[in-house]
C-alpha cells in the first residue's frame, strides 16, 4: 500500500473522553478538523494523547462508538 497517494487530514484534540480497550491502552477523544472547524468526530487513539495535540488521520471518515 502506497500511503503517499492517500490524502491525510490534520485534526486537533479538543476533549479527552476516557480510556477504553481491554487494558485501557486506548484513549477515546473528540477531534476537530483543522481545515473545517465546524466538523468534529470521536476517535480512538493508541498511545499518549492530551488536549490540544495535533493528530494525522489516514482515514478521516471513520468514527468510534461512544463509551458506555
From Swiss-Prot:
GO terms for molecular function: structural constituent of ribosome. GO terms for cellular component: cytosolic small ribosomal subunit. InterPro entries: NA-bd_OB-fold, Ribosomal_eS28, Ribosomal_eS28_CS. SUPFAM superfamilies: Nucleic acid-binding proteins. GO terms for biological process: maturation of SSU-rRNA; ribosomal small subunit assembly; translation. Keywords: Cytoplasm, Ribonucleoprotein, Ribosomal protein. It is found in: Cytoplasm. Component of the small ribosomal subunit (SSU). Mature N.crassa ribosomes consist of a small (40S) and a large (60S) subunit. The 40S small subunit contains 1 molecule of ribosomal RNA (18S rRNA) and at least 32 different proteins. The large 60S subunit contains 3 rRNA molecules (26S, 5.8S and 5S rRNA) and at least 42 different proteins. Component of the ribosome, a large ribonucleoprotein complex responsible for the synthesis of proteins in the cell. The small ribosomal subunit (SSU) binds messenger RNAs (mRNAs) and translates the encoded message by selecting cognate aminoacyl-transfer RNA (tRNA) molecules. The large subunit (LSU) contains the ribosomal catalytic site termed the peptidyl transferase center (PTC), which catalyzes the formation of peptide bonds, thereby polymerizing the amino acids delivered by tRNAs into a polypeptide chain. HAMAP family: Ribosomal_eS28. Belongs to the eukaryotic ribosomal protein eS28 family. This is Small ribosomal subunit protein eS28. The lineage of its organism: Eukaryota, Fungi, Dikarya, Ascomycota, Pezizomycotina.
